[in-house]
Amino acid sequence: MSKVKLTKESIVALLTQGKDLEFEEDQNLVAFNFKTFCLENLDQIKKMSVISCLTFLKNRQSIMKVIKQSDFTFGKITIKKTSDRIGATDMTFRRLDSLIRVRLVEETGNSENLNTIKSKIASHPLIQAYGLPLDDAKSVRLAIMLGGSLPLIASVDSFEMISVVLAIYQDAKYKDLGIDPKKYDTKEALGKVCTVLKSKAFEMNEDQVKKGKEYAAILSSSNPNAKGSIAMEHYSETLNKFYEMFGVKKQAKLTELA
């Protein structure tokens, strides 16, 4: 019996040859833990300013397309375009995105940075789509989490309840949020978050439930349908003129016509 590395070729051999094969145990036993990964890699983005972190989140999709065109290197880190097997220490775009979100949430502990994040993130399309009110630090932290990989971030200490409550909200309100279940399974995402919490033996005690209820109260006060109304108000003066041409009396607020 021979032990080999887990590669595409060795898998083919496993399935097609009669000889006994085993994969090297170190490859089987090394499990990915984002909490550990986060502690080991946060320094890689320490030079990023708060504004730069927010710019990354606002332009996430465009940045992802560029990064995934080829191997992308920054500092000592390389995100590979293709990889037969992603290792526990390898950087990926999703892991980088999660690192930046964790970094930003931590920055909300500083009042000056909190105010900066609050003012800048309000213009992000996803925050407007959720109709999320930005009234305090907790609501700003929720804003930072929107669009992030909740199963990854849930493994980081103190991020458990914000992750699970947001996952529940997305599952409950996926239609209002315009989430296509074929592209993003909210129930599956919630299950992954809970699996992460269970694996770290996280206990939802009274204090944690209280924290969760605070996040839930903020989310329940959001209005996912407000984005269109906000945009309409922006053009209300001009749009009302056209309404008048169709015989509709001009109103103080365009939304009152609905």
UniProtKB/Swiss-Prot annotation:
It is found in: Virion. InterPro entries: Tospo_nucleocap. One of its GO terms (molecular function) is RNA binding. Its main location: virion. It holds the Pfam family Tospo_nucleocap. It comes from the Viruses. The keyword RNA-binding applies. Disulfide bonds: none annotated. Keywords: Capsid protein, Helical capsid protein, Ribonucleoprotein, RNA-binding, Viral nucleoprotein, Virion. One of its GO terms (cellular component) is viral nucleocapsid. Encapsidates the genome protecting it from nucleases. The encapsidated genomic RNA is termed the nucleocapsid (NC) and serves as template for transcription and replication. The NC have a helical organization. Belongs to the tospovirus nucleocapsid protein family. Homotrimer. Binds the viral genomic RNA. The N-terminus and C-terminus are involved in homooligomerization and play an essential role in viral RNA synthesis. This is Nucleoprotein. It comes from Tomato spotted wilt virus (strain Bulgarian L3). The gene is N.
